[in-house]
């Protein structure tokens, strides 16, 4: 069997990915590609990063057998990969540590980033404080409203948070403005991309820094069960926690991989973020991928109760994995995610992020149809502290 090896030398995943960027950014992107190629071969860089992941972030994260959840649902054993236990409460810091060290090595002392739910913004502000880097975060006005506490956290950590009032005032627009800022300040600034999006080499860099999730999971499940899981489930917005979890398992064809998008109010409505179910191929933020578009090819607004999933595109590698059938992409509604969040709270005493609750919702249905000796692993990408007010308001609305 040919081993899976992506991207190609041009930074493409099949037809996806690439570099659709203005000339003003090309030099910075090529410089980043060169710097990344160098650090991949540098044991000292890896050693410093691993030291921070262990002693600052708190890795490795546990692979937890959710016994009560398993018993309640019936069917397969359910394990949770506890990325919610990382410093800052989500998987995002795996990537921000790596990229901030890379920026430091390139002599760039200023960092610009975008954030949706605020988790990437907090993780970026955190590592900038740690490494004494200047930090500017762009965030959509609508997301600022939803994630007020994360905005305060970023400011507390020394970041400047810029409200984006264009378009839908969410993640897509924050990326647009962050890219514009980078064009103007490219000489001394690194764009710290938060997901497996953007021009090459960003999707590859972010994937590689997040692959620690799947690498640890592989070792841990073999220790606990003596075999690989039958299925792995992760939520997909841009797709970084999912690709980090999936990538070390792609060549293991006996392991079914499920990426769960936000169906919002339902796939039959306009209010969803189900790019894989409803999208067409297009270009956004420097990369070719599946996108939510109207009949004129204009990018449409995505909707989800979860601020981290309402991106109208999806990473180029996910786009390829859909086409070749290696990952099955499904969608879960706001209501199903809320139900799953409550179930996990009540059965395991764990409040997941709304993003992660989408994965729990699908895994619940999956496990129910499986045998007791089979295993499902859920990537619990983040904790739900940031979402408590959103959940409270949603549940009040139901009452």
From Swiss-Prot:
The modification N6-(pyridoxal phosphate)lysine is found at residue 92. Keywords: Amino-acid biosynthesis, Aromatic amino acid biosynthesis, Lyase, Pyridoxal phosphate, Tryptophan biosynthesis. InterPro entries: Trp_synth_b_CS, Trp_synth_beta, Trp_synth_beta/beta-like, TrpB-like_PALP, TrpB-like_PALP_sf. It catalyses: (1S,2R)-1-C-(indol-3-yl)glycerol 3-phosphate + L-serine = D-glyceraldehyde 3-phosphate + L-tryptophan + H2O. The keyword Metal-binding does not apply. Its EC number is 4.2.1.20. Pathway: Amino-acid biosynthesis; L-tryptophan biosynthesis; L-tryptophan from chorismate: step 5/5. This is Tryptophan synthase beta chain. Its cofactor is pyridoxal 5'-phosphate. Tetramer of two alpha and two beta chains. It is an enzyme of class 4 (lyase). Belongs to the TrpB family. The beta subunit is responsible for the synthesis of L-tryptophan from indole and L-serine. GO terms for cellular component: cytoplasm. HAMAP family: Trp_synth_beta (MF_00133). GO terms for molecular function: tryptophan synthase activity. The keyword Amino-acid biosynthesis applies.
């Amino acid at each position: 069997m040919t081993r899976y090896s992506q991207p190609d030398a041009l930074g493409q995943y099949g037809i996806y990915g690439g570099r659709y960027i203005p000339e003003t950014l090309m030099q910075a992107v090529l410089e980043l590609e060169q710097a990344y190629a160098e650090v991949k071969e540098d044991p000292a860089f890896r050693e410093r990063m691993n030291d921070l992941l262990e002693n600052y972030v708190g890795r490795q994260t546990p692979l937890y057998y959710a016994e009560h959840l398993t018993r309640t649902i019936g069917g397969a054993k359910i394990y949770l990969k506890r990325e919610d236990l990382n410093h800052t409460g989500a998987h995002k810091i795996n990537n921000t540590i790596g990229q901030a060290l890379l920026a430091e090595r390139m002599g760039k002392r200023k960092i610009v980033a975008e954030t949706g739910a605020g988790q990437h913004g907090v993780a970026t502000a955190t590592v900038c404080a740690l490494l004494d880097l200047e930090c500017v975060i762009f965030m959509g006005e609508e997301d600022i409203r939803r994630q007020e506490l994360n905005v305060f956290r970023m400011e507390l950590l020394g970041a400047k948070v810029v409200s984006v009032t264009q378009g839908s005032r969410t993640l897509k627009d924050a990326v647009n403005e962050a890219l514009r800022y980078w064009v103007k300040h490219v000489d001394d600034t690194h764009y710290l991309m938060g997901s497996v999006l953007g021009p090459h080499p960003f999707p590859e860099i972010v994937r590689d820094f997040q692959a620690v999730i799947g690498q640890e999971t592989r070792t841990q499940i073999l220790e606990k069960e003596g075999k690989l899981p039958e299925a792995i489930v992760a939520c997909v917005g841009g797709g970084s926690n999912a690709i980090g979890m999936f990538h070390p398992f792609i060549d293991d064809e006996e392991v079914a991989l499920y990426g769960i998008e936000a169906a919002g109010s339902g796939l039959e409505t306009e209010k969803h973020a189900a790019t894989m179910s409803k999208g067409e191929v297009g270009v956004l933020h420097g990369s070719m991928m599946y996108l939510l578009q109207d009949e004129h090819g204009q990018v449409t607004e995505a909707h989800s109760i979860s601020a981290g999933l309402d991106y109208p595109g999806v990473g180029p590698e996910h786009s390829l994995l859909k086409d070749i059938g290696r990952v099955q992409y499904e969608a879960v509604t706001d209501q199903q995610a809320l139900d799953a969040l409550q179930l996990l709270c009540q059965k395991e005493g764990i409040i997941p992020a709304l993003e992660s609750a989408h994965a729990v919702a699908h895994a619940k249905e999956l496990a129910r149809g499986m045998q007791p000796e089979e295993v499902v692993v859920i990537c619990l990408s983040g904790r739900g502290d940031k979402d408590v007010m959103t959940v409270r308001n949603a549940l009040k609305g139901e009452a």
